Regions:
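Residues at the C-termini of beta-strands that transition into short coil/loop
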Residues: 59, 67, 94
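Short acidic (Asp/Glu) and glycine-rich catalytic loops that position anionic groups and cofactors
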Residues: 64-70
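A short, conserved alpha-helix in the catalytic core of glycosyltransferases
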Residues: 2-29, 34-64
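C-terminal, non-catalytic tails of nucleotide-sugar-dependent glycosyltransferases
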Residues: 1-10, 14, 19, 55, ...
């Protein structure tokens, strides 16, 4: 759909390459420490949207990000339990009434390949 080539609004972006004004950061109380690793950026973006601001993706912004380089992979029982807990907290907070206004309703939610819903 060529979306990666265009500036457009999204519900959330990765914190690995995010810019936000300080006053907005403070208005929504920053990143929630309940999400120490997973979902902290998504939760933050959703709270920014609730406050009336847009989350904008800009394809001209570039950076190298080595996923999990500093914290390692989720390969221990402790890390997997933390991830499971953060997932449960995120879903409890956001999935009850949330519908992503930027996700095409004609696409499936069952995968990550943007295939058509059938």
């Amino acid at each position: 759909f060529n979306r990666l080539c265009m500036v457009h609004d999204l519900s959330a972006v990765t914190a690995a390459l995010m810019m936000v004004r300080r006053d907005v950061f403070e208005q929504v109380n920053g990143l929630d420490e309940e999400f120490s690793v997973a979902f902290n950026d998504v939760d933050f973006c959703l709270r920014i949207r609730e406050a009336g601001y847009l989350i904008v993706f800009n394809p001209d912004a570039e950076a190298w990000h080595y996923e999990s380089k500093s914290r390692g992979i989720e390969d221990t029982v402790e890390k997997q339990e933390r991830f499971r807990g953060e997932t449960e907290r995120f879903l409890a907070r956001w999935t009850k009434d949330y519908v992503d206004p930027y996700y095409n309703v004609n696409l499936t939610l069952k995968g990550q390949d943007f295939s058509l819903r059938v």
